[in-house]
Design a protein with these regions (language model features):
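Short hydrophobic/aromatic-rich motifs at helix boundaries and adjacent loops
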Residues: 3-6, 30-34, 59-64
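Claisen-condensing/thiolase-fold acyl-transfer catalytic domains that form or cleave C-C bonds
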Residues: 47-126
Length: 126
């Protein structure tokens, strides 16, 4: 604890952004597809993606690659980035806006500061 080995400090945010930008979209897309497949679905069956709040261009790129049309998207511009809860708030908004039907496949996407990306596949409904 005294040596701060228990946490990750970003000492150069600009350099980190420069390294993340070229890989983030493909990593988000890859983990989304893998989550669908590992859950017994085809990636084309994904009906909703709840994503960590990012810059709009990255969000748009991921949604387009996964085939999610604008009318089925939730971009958290009314909330802003709230950290790990972003995908859950997007899922809440999708449910509130009636974007999900029983049996739909929803995928939640997130990322960590240590160059990690993750996805969870959820079959919606009873």
């Amino acid at each position: 604890m005294a040596n701060r080995m228990h946490c990750f400090d970003v000492t150069d945010p600009a350099a980190m952004k420069e390294r993340l930008d070229p890989v983030s979209a493909q990593r988000f897309i890859g983990v989304a597809r893998a989550a669908a497949e590992q859950s017994g679905f085809r990636p084309e069956e994904i009906r909703f993606v709840g994503m960590l709040h990012t810059k709009r261009s990255l969000f748009d790129q991921v949604m387009a690659a996964l085939g999610i049309p604008p009318e089925r998207q939730v971009y958290l511009d009314e909330y802003g980035h709230m950290s790990a809860i972003d995908p859950l708030v997007a899922l809440y908004e999708a449910e509130r806006r009636a974007l999900l039907a029983p049996g739909d496949l929803a995928v939640l996407l997130s990322a960590g500061t240590g160059y990690t990306w993750a996805a969870t596949a959820i079959r919606w409904g009873p």
